[in-house]
A protein has these predicted regions:
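A ligand-binding cleft/hinge motif common to bilobed small-molecule-binding domains
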Residues: 14-24, 69-74, 97-98, 102-132
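Extracytoplasmic/secreted envelope proteins and their assembly/folding machinery
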Residues: 1, 5, 9, 25, ...
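Periplasmic-binding protein-like
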Residues: 33-41, 108, 116-155, 174-199
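Ligand-binding clefts/hinges and TM-proximal coupling segments of bilobed small-molecule sensing domains
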Residues: 65-83, 122-123, 155-204
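Extended ligand-binding regions for polar small-molecule ligands
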Residues: 51, 56-57, 62-64, 112, ...
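Short, Asp-centered acidic motifs that coordinate Mg2+ and/or phosphate
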Residues: 6, 10-11, 102-103, 137
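Bilobed "Venus flytrap"/periplasmic-binding protein-like clamshell domains
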Residues: 2, 16-17, 34-93, 109-110
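Acidic, polar ligand-binding/catalytic clefts
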Residues: 1-52, 192-202
Length: 204
C-alpha cells in the first residue's frame, strides 16, 4: 500500500482482498474473483461439511486467515478438533495425503491448485459450505475516480460479455501447459452472480 500511495505504481491486480480495513487506505476496482474457505478431503470419505470435523485432525496453513477462522470455529462450536498448522500449502497437502489429517481448510481456489498437483487428483474433493468469502480486486489510489472508472468499465465489459467465463474455463477447467495440470475448478454461484452484476463490494 505505501508503494501505491507514493506513486511507485498506479494499480496492482493480483489476489489482493478488498476489505473494509484496506478501503481506508486504498480504492478497489470491481471484483475480479471471489473465493470461499472450504475443505479438501478424500473423495467418498466421511467428511462432507465442517460439522463432520468434530474430534478430528484438520490441517491448515500457518499465518493465514483460514488458520484464525478454524481456531475460532473450534472454540465457538466446541468441536474438539486437533488443528495442525503446516508451514505452507504444499506441506498442508502432504499432511492430508499421509492421513495425519482428514481435511485441509483453505481458500477453495488454492485447494484446487494443490489438488491439481497431487499424484492422483481424482482421489480428492473440495467440500463444505464456505465459512468465509473474500473478494479479490485491483487496488488503486483513492483520489483517482477517473482511473477507477476506466478499470471498472473494462472489467465489467469482460464479465458481462461472457469473455470472463471463457477465460475461467480455459484456465480453471482445462489442462494448463507446461505440466498440463487441470484444476477442475467449477465456476461458483458467487462468481456467476458477479459476472452478471459487476460490483466493487467488500465481502468482509
Amino acid at each position: 500500500i505505501p508503494l501505491l500511495q507514493n506513486g511507485t505504481f498506479d494499480f496492482e491486480c493480483g489476489s489482493t482482498t478488498n476489505n473494509l480495513e484496506r478501503q481506508k487506505q486504498a480504492a478497489f476496482s470491481d471484483t475480479i474473483f471471489v473465493v470461499g474457505t472450504r475443505l479438501l478431503t478424500k473423495k467418498g470419505g466421511e467428511i462432507k461439511d465442517f460439522a463432520d470435523l468434530k474430534g478430528k485432525a484438520v490441517v491448515v496453513t500457518s499465518g493465514t486467515t483460514s488458520e484464525v477462522l478454524l481456531h475460532k470455529l473450534n472454540d465457538e462450536k466446541k468441536m474438539d478438533m486437533r488443528i495442525i498448522s503446516a508451514k505452507d500449502h504444499g506441506d498442508s497437502f502432504r499432511t492430508l495425503e499421509s492421513g495425519r489429517a482428514v481435511a485441509f481448510m483453505m481458500d477453495d481456489a488454492l485447494l484446487a491448485g494443490e489438488r491439481a498437483k497431487a499424484k492422483k487428483p481424482d482421489n480428492w474433493d473440495i467440500v463444505g459450505t464456505a465459512q468465509s468469502k473474500e473478494a479479490y480486486g485491483c487496488m488503486l489510489r483513492k483520489d483517482d475516480p477517473q482511473f477507477k472508472k476506466l478499470i471498472d468499465d473494462t472489467i465489467a465489459q469482460v464479465q458481462t460479455s461472457g469473455e470472463a467465463e471463457k477465460w475461467f474455463d480455459k484456465w480453471f477447467k482445462n489442462p494448463i501447459p507446461p505440466k498440463n495440470l487441470n484444476m477442475n475448478f467449477e465456476l461458483s454461484d458467487d462468481m456467476k452472480a458477479l459476472f452478471k452484476s459487476p460490483n466493487d463490494k467488500a465481502l468482509n
